[in-house]
Amino acid sequence: MNILFFLHPKQEVAYVYDDCTLRQVLETMEHHKYASIPMLNRQGEYVGTITEGDLLWGMKKYTNLNLKEAEHIFIHDFERKADYVAVAADSDMKDLISRAMSQNFVPVVDDQNKFIGIITCLLYTSPS
């Protein structure tokens, strides 16, 4: 079975760029109710995932942080504890399932590492 059958395309998925500010990332994650979000560079390549935990540990370095200051802190300066590993669009189901067992979502990239969407666990664990 083709894994693209389960794909939420990039156009339907929230993501952030690695040059976004902390405030932009926080507001995007809050708006979409995401605990983790794909991060891309401006060329559209998947560079990793930023999580609520990454943000919390990163903000610990700043004293008296407020939303105004968060507009000047860039997300690429935050250490990421564990990036979600992407799968290629032509991967097989076995590879997808092994990744999905340890990740909230599985990023999918094309053969040039361009982000094309995500596959979520709910899509293929649902009985319907």
Q: How should these model regions be labeled?
A:
Residues 51-64:
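Structured interaction and signal-relay segments at domain junctions
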Residues 1-28, 34, 40-42, 46-47, ...:
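Bateman/CBS regulatory modules and CBS-like beta-alpha motifs in cytosolic regions of diverse proteins
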Residues 49-51, 106, 118-122:
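Short hydrophobic beta-strand motif reused across regulatory alpha/beta modules
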Residues 124-128:
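Conserved small/polar residues in nucleotide/adenosyl-binding loops
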